[in-house]
Amino acid sequence: MLARLAAKRLLEIRQVFRQPTSQVTRSLSTALNYHLDSPDNKPDLPWEFSEANQSKVKEILSYYPSNYKQSAVIPLLDLAQQQNGGWLPVSAMNAVAKVIEVAPIRVYEVATFYSMFNRAKVGKYHLLVCGTTPCMIRGSRDIESALLDHLGVKRGEVTKDGLFSVGEMECMGCCVNAPMITVADYSNGSEGYTYNYFEDVTPEKVVEIVEKLRKGEKPPHGTQNPKRIKCGPEGGNKTLLGEPKPPQFRDLDAC
C-alpha cells in the first residue's frame, strides 16, 4: 500500500517538473530566460555604444580598478539598455563583454538574472507594477488590470503606437507607500532617461498618469495621496509630536 502511494506521488512530482516554469510558479520576469534569434536580435547584428555614450563608458570604468573591469557589467548593461530604447539585444551584451574583456556568457548570466534588464522590446514608457506581498495586499493586481485594460495589451506586450508596455517587478522597497508602480522613460534614449516611482496609486490614478505621459507631460512622481507627505501617515504625525527628550545619564561623580 505504501509503495503504491509513494509511486503515485513520485509520478505527480515528475509531471509537475515536466511543465514549463511559468505553469509551476509565478514568473518574476516577463521575458524568456533563454535567447532565440530573430531578425532584429541576433549576434551578427552590429551594435556599439554611441559617440555620446563612449565618454560615459570611460567614466563608469574609472570607478573600478583596471583589473576588475568586469565589476562594471551592471552599469554598462544599464547604459546600453537606455541607448537601445529600453531593451538589450544580444549584440549589445556582446559589446559590453568586449568593453570589460570577459567571455560573452558572463554578461548573459547577469542580463538573464536581473528582471530589470529587458531582453525584448518595450514601450518608450515601460510601466512596472510591484507584485510583492504588501503591494498585492493593497491592490496591485487591480492596478495592473487597470493598466492592461486601458492600454489594450497583455503583460509584456507593447501598444501599437510603441509608447507603452507593462511588466511586473518584485519589491521596489517602498512598502509603506504601497501599492506603487515605476515608470522607466526611454523616450529620449540615454539622454533624459528617468526612472521614477509613483506611490499610493489607485486604478484611476495610474490611468491618469498614462494619459499625461501620452500628452508628453511629466506627472509628479512620489506619493499620489495628497493627504500624505512622502512616507508619513495621512493627516500628519501621530507620534513624536514634540522635541524628543535628551538621553538620561547617570551622575558619574555620585558613583
From Swiss-Prot:
One Pfam family per UniProt: 2Fe-2S_thioredx
Catalytic activity field: a ubiquinone + NADH + 5 H(+)(in) = a ubiquinol + NAD(+) + 4 H(+)(out)
Annotated segments matching region Disordered: 214-255
Comment on bound cofactor: Binds 1 [2Fe-2S] cluster.
The keyword DNA-binding belongs to this UniProt entry's keyword annotation: no
Entry keyword set: 2Fe-2S, Electron transport, Iron, Iron-sulfur, Membrane, Metal-binding, Mitochondrion, Mitochondrion inner membrane, NAD, Oxidoreductase, Respiratory chain, Transit peptide, Translocase, Transport, Ubiquinone
Compartments (UniProt record): Mitochondrion inner membrane
NCBIfam families (alphabetical): nuoE_fam
Protein name: NADH dehydrogenase [ubiquinone] flavoprotein 2, mitochondrial
Organism in which the protein naturally occurs: Arabidopsis thaliana
